[in-house]
């Protein structure tokens, strides 16, 4: 799981950093190269969770090909479709919705409050623990199950897995009946941002990393983050009994991440041979 640097937003002060390119295609290219290497080392049944946000073209940008000033660039989908051409299976586009987004001064469009999380895999068969991230069903759904479905209506046949009123009201005749209180995780996740007292001001919330890791990585599995930042993914991975490998260009963030992960795991050897 990873979240690469935003495009044309921040300067991390490092040579060969990603995010300060002069054109969207020049930003996408290095990311694709990184993720092709990730694909090479990923298990055949592994998953890749990619968090990326879009941005708008500005007059201060130079050499932007095909982007007019004030135009939404479409970077997430440009990257996702390019990765699909490289052989990745694009399995899901998850919307990370934030109720506490960064305020914006624009008065001629809605304010942004979401980012994309793409689920990509190496094949059509892969590890995905749907029960680990299942959601409780809504109260209204439980009530509908209680009353079942009426006869002689367009809903008489119900939906797969739905029980009839007779099954619920007469369990002795129809056999044991149980209502599953959980439903499959949906693709809009409402998770607020959480401030972190550290040097990295673009850290995503631990709950976001937790959901992806629980669903896509088995216990004792390895989580790889090629853009480690302040170590949110690493801290969550260690807390969930997963192994972790983090890669970071900025030494300051590396030290911050090491300290953060050590607090969770208590392992003093963390950071030895840090990439």
Where are these regions (language model features)?
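Core catalytic lobe of class I
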Residues: 1-266, 274
């Amino acid at each position: 799981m990873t979240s690469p640097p935003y495009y044309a937003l921040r300067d991390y002060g490092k040579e060969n950093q990603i995010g300060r390119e002069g054109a969207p295609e020049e930003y996408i290219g290095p990311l694709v190269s990184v993720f092709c290497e990730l694909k090479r080392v990923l298990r055949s049944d592994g998953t890749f969770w990619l968090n990326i946000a879009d941005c708008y073209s500005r007059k201060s940008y130079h050499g932007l090909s095909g982007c007019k000033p004030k135009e939404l660039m479409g970077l997430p989908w440009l990257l996702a479709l390019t990765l699909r051409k490289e052989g990745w299976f694009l399995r899901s586009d998850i919307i990370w919705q934030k109720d506490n987004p960064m305020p914006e001064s624009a008065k001629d469009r809605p304010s942004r409050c979401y980012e994309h999380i793409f689920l990509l895999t190496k094949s059509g068969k892969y590890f995905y623990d749907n029960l680990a991230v299942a959601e409780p069903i809504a109260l209204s759904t439980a009530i509908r199950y209680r009353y079942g479905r009426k006869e002689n209506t367009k809903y008489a046949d119900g939906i797969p897995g739905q029980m009839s009123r007779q099954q619920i009201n007469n369990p002795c005749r129809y056999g044991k009946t149980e209502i599953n209180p959980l439903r499959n995780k949906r693709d809009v996740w409402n998770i607020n941002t959480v401030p972190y007292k550290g040097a990295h001001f673009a850290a995503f919330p631990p709950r976001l990393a937790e959901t992806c890791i629980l669903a896509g990585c088995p216990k004792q599995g390895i989580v790889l983050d090629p853009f480690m930042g302040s170590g949110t993914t690493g801290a969550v991975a260690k807390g969930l009994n997963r192994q972790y490998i983090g890669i970071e260009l900025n030494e300051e963030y590396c030290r911050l991440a090491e300290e953060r992960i050590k607090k969770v795991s208590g392992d003093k050897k963390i950071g030895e041979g840090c990439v």
